[in-house]
Amino acid sequence: MLIDNLDKGWPTRGASREDILILRSLLGATRKLQRQLERRSVAFHCLVFLRNDIHDLLVAETPDKGKDTAIVLDWDDAEAFKRIVYNRVSGTLTEKASFLEAWQAIADVQIGARDSFSYLVERTLMRPRDLLRFVRRCIEVAVNRGHERITSDDMLKAEESYSEDMLLETQFELRDVYRENADPFYKFLGCNVYISSGEVLERANGDEKLVELLVWFGFLGVKEPRQLEPRFSYEVRYNVAKLLAPVKENKAVFVIHPAFRRALECTG
């Protein structure tokens, strides 16, 4: 039995204790049903799909942890995103092809000196829907320009509208869980990509909880001198405390996520 969309429409980080109680009761019922069917020699397994944030709340609110086995769908690997796009593109090809061949059939493989697919993935919050939205925007631009394939210029143009989409969506998600200061994003308009903790706190009107939420949603990442690349919440399983630890010791700076830079006209 597969159960999905239970948490559809629930705000990010906004599930109530009543919501979690419903989930606990459901899982308890599936275990009971499994035991009853097994006594009749009927094989039965139930798989419940939950968002990461809802699962974390469920674990925190469950006293008897460990009864259910969690399988994490790993979306922090670019190879998984290649598979998503390949499955959608390969059906249009006459011959079986590798991902690179399939991608090359519909788009330029380079943006300047950079791999074009990696460029798109880096501008997502590592969610499949982000990548598919970006690709759709690229297709729209290519079609409007009369191109048979997506060019690198099409991708750069599509990034403008995609970045606006991401900014608005994240703004709506933040409003669902934090109405006290729900529109902080435009305070970062025109800011540098790399920004000190003091400046972030100033732009957030001194609201430390808001800063934590901006990190949790992936709007802000953290860059330490010892690291080549900044890290974002989805790369540490949304462990915000771990990300913020070097910032609080003045050993790191904040970074605006690439998905939002075009919309906010960031510099640097």
Q: Which residues are covered by each model-predicted region?
A:
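The catalytic "switch" region of P-loop NTPases
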Residues: 6-113
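C-terminal leucine-rich, beta-strand-based interaction scaffolds used for sensing/assembly
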Residues: 111-141, 146-268
